[in-house]
Amino acid sequence: MDLNFFHKTRILDGGMGQELLRRGMKPKGTLWSASALLDTNYHKLLLDTHLDFIKAGAEVIVTTSFATRKIRLLENKIEDKFEYLNKKAGEIAQNTKKYYPNVLIAGGLPPQNLTYKPDIRSDNKIRDDFFNQAKLLNPYIDFFYFDVLSSIREIKIGIESIREFHKPFLVGMHISEGTKLPSGEKISDLIDSLDINGLLGITLSCVSPENFQSNLDEIKSLGVPFGFKLNAYLKTNPMPKLDKTNKNQKVINPNELLGIREDLTPEKMAQFAKKFKDAGATIIGGCCETRPSHIEMFTGLKD
């Protein structure tokens, strides 16, 4: 694909997991969105949800692979489904091209351990986990998307792990609150230590609009295409409550755990997005609690 793809304004999809829950998916354990891959009765629902984001204006969709990482499957005692679930995520996303051949598929590579926390395991373990998931998604995708990573170390290891696939990548960093990653590092620390060969751009992922505003100047200073996947959660820092829920494998709708901001209507979120676009952001998308209606409003920001 064109490495300059994000040099102009592009629209990404929104929050697949919460949208699936709204549409009737019943989560199993802590699998959340992966429940729609595990149960064949939900495969059409998953495809239709991808398609609705595209109809709303998304030029890029992300595979539903956030909860198909190995640790999440181990928690739910279905690690034997690792290959099946990741391939199915790629296959269903790829099927959207039958209807919209120009849509791009991003292979979502989430943190390979806990969400919103830096991975303190060995480099080799992290690298192997990224590689094994990337290998399964690779045949179905146009580029890789590192989704909601919490440390520069994980980002660097993740990039190393995909090099043999010769595909470009988008980096999605997470900041729960303030101006530092959960690892304590600053955004500006990233670019100095990163091999940017194949880098499409950098986003802040699963962040509130206000949090992105706080970090706008620093991410802009990196000198690469930048943007966001905004969430509409009430809580900006879900730890440690999310930790406890994951460890107990408690079945809970993340909407109930983290809350929903009623003020972030599609119109209000589009106002934030316009402000960020006017400041130079070209990668515009949503994360948790952003629906096709939000993405439709974002399309008005296209160049």
PLM regions with names:
Residues M1-D303:
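Domain-level signal for soluble alpha/beta catalytic cores
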